[in-house]
Amino acid sequence: MMKKKKFKFKVDFELEELSSVPFVNGVLFCKMRLLDGGSFTAESSREVVQANCVRWRKKFSFMCKMSASAATGILDPCIYRVSVRKELKGGKAYAKLGFADLNLAEFAGSGNTTRRCLLEGYDTKNTRQDNSILKVLISMQLMSGDPCFKTPPSTSMSIPIAGESESLQEDRKGGETLKVHLGIADLSAKSASVPDELGACGHSRTSSYASQQSKVSGYSTCHSRSSSFSELCHRRNTSVGSTSTGVESILEPCDEIEQKIAEPNLDTADKEDTASEKLSRCPVKQDSVESQLKRVDDTRVDADDIVEKILQSQDFSLDSSAEEEGLRLFVGPGGSTTFGSHHLPNRVGSGAYEQVVIKR
């Protein structure tokens, strides 16, 4: 049995954020644990969910031991687990939302590296795992050991090209294509160019086997990046017409532009037919919506009709007798006044109070 090489690294781990959290509110925290090469454990601060995102921005530094085969020089896996948890009962208990396992051997000697990873579930049989994305920054520095070593193939889901955005972005959607706007002819040529767009993808979600092998064969990350970038630039897609294209058959953006410009223009009659068909579909759709609204209105009671019936049933004419039955002002001896009806003098006595009459 061959003796393995021993290495010691200083790891600077920064816990950035957790996005796409399926909670409107709540308090989340993380527990970090080094499963191989040490006994480091730590907990992050407890932060509140804001706009479906939790930001920690907390840095941790620790020492990590690694080993490598003396024959190949490839570092053995060193797993670092980040467990995301949610507070329950005011912090007295917690629930495990998911975890992310990071192989620190992939980041050895690569400088500052940003990694986004989907959370894995603890109980995938009974619960559905949410698509939360954990963002971390890892930097490793060799403290002791042979500086000549090889990193294992990366599990990142994109080819690390310098100047490109990081992998596993939130706004990234599957099957993104580079669209070239060439006028109205693109509207009628969409049905004919579906296989072309399926074969032409502007971004590779998974790294190819050759790019992974280039990482293994080189000691520096710069060499692997340059080799994978040159491989991507010189790759050509020979079977564009087939719809069963995988990640390996990727067409360059420049090839796609040249291919679309070189396509013959369709006849003007075809353009007019497609335009007239699209215009003729709109009134039909609008009529169907109006008929549906009419059916809904027929089942409802019209409030205006009810108000009109109530107003018609009321009698708003003036009653002449109501004018004569109001209060009257009476003046008594000594200038005393009182209010009452026209029967007041009869109760008080004749001549005691006289009614005040105002002539109009």
Swiss-Prot record:
Any idea which UniProt keywords this protein has? Phosphoprotein
Limits of the C2 NT-type domain: 1-142
InterPro entries, per database record: EEIG1/2-like (IPR039931), NT-C2 (IPR019448)
Which positions carry Phosphoserine? S228, S276, S288, S320, S321, S350
Signal peptide positions are none
Q: What disulfide bonds does the UniProt entry report for this chain?
A: none
Family annotation (Pfam families): NT-C2
Hey, which family's this protein in?
Belongs to the EEIG family.
Q: What is this protein called?
A: EEIG family member 2
Q: Identify the species of origin.
A: Homo sapiens (Human)
User: Which lineage do the record's taxonomy fields give for this organism?
Assistant: Eukaryota, Metazoa, Chordata, Craniata, Vertebrata
